[in-house]
Design a protein with these regions (language model features):
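Acidic, low-complexity cytosolic segments
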Residues: 2-3, 13-142, 148-151
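Extended amphipathic alpha-helical coiled-coil/heptad-repeat regions
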Residues: 127-307
């Protein structure tokens, strides 16, 4: 689960501003530099979601769909645990987003508590997926309430489902994760969606939503792989087309590199991310040098005309 959750806004004039935050460790803090980089990526590059690597930490940020609040500048960020699955985090995002929108307030203390509860909810959800026993205990509590409310038929149905569905749910999630790790993305999607159906049967709607979102995300991976292959070829062509008379073409490298970084983040491909980040840094340096060369060329021309 994430180490921290941060709700912030980006003001067009003043930049990012933290609305609420909650950290599992007190010494964990999101720095102004990270928020500034998020602001640049969200606003200047118009990225809906993005990830940053800084000081051995991973930070994920995504724009919140807050039209119902008449706000178009709310963002939610997480500091990730080492080795944490980004696909799972993205799948949880929708649940957290909904809670924030439903309970949004100008009271900072209340919003901090809301983020704390959201993080606890994430932990509970992930524990349920790993331990069928926890789901069974939840079902028992729910059926007791149904019986107290006189809902005998519904209680019996839920009791019957609770006999084997939690184990079938856990087994299906395990299969889905194995398919995902082995890069069988279509099979993984099918298993995640099947697991979501099991979760709905026993009225675990948060788990169902999480698994459905994860299945849909994994289902996009084959297309992302095709896009990545196309971008790699496009990048190679741009570089091969650059010669001494067309140095300005270095500018064309940045956009496909940025997109390749985003795709690599989806696959948790840290080796490619490091290589692409280095390539971007060198390309940006080349762009600066070309700019300096053009300025020098212009000044040389002006001086020669005066001689």
């Amino acid at each position: 689960m994430p180490r921290a959750i941060i709700l912030y806004e980006i003001d067009p004039s003043f930049g990012p501003n933290i609305i609420a935050e909650y950290y599992l460790k007190q010494d964990d803090k999101i720095s102004p530099a990270v928020l500034k980089e998020f602001s640049e990526k969200h606003i200047e590059k118009e990225l809906f979601e993005t990830t940053i690597f800084k000081d051995d930490n991973r930070y994920f940020s995504k724009k919140i769909n807050a039209k119902s609040l008449n706000k178009d500048n709310l963002y939610l960020s997480f500091i990730l645990q080492e080795g944490e699955d980004l696909v799972s985090l993205k799948s949880i995002f929708e649940n957290v987003e909904e809670k924030i929108i439903q309970n949004f307030s100008d009271d900072k203390k209340r919003m901090n508590e809301l983020l704390q509860n959201a993080l606890n909810s994430i932990m509970s959800l992930l524990q349920k997926l790993q331990e069928p026993k926890i789901i069974k205990e939840t079902i028992n509590d729910r059926t007791k309430k149904m019986l107290d409310d006189g809902k005998l038929t519904e209680a019996r149905e839920l009791i019957d489902l609770g006999e084997d569905i939690p184990e079938r749910l856990a087994a299906e999630v395990k299969s889905a994760d194995q398919f995902l790790n082995n890069e069988f993305y279509k099979k993984a999607k099918k298993s995640f969606l099947k697991a979501a159906e099991f979760a709905s049967l026993i009225q675990e709607e948060e788990i169902a939503s999480f698994l459905k979102n994860k299945g849909e995300q994994v289902g996009l991976f084959p297309e992302l792989i095709k896009e990545r292959e196309g971008l790699n070829k496009h990048l190679e062509k741009i570089f091969n087309d650059i010669d001494i008379t067309q140095l300005s073409l270095y500018n064309n490298l940045i956009e496909p590199i940025d997109r390749l970084i985003e795709i690599s983040l989806s696959f948790e491909d840290h080796e490619s991310i490091n290589k692409l980040t280095k390539l971007k840094s060198i390309s940006e340096r080349a762009i600066r040098l070309v700019r300096e060369l053009n300025d020098s060329d212009k000044k040389i021309g002006e001086i020669i005309k005066k001689i």
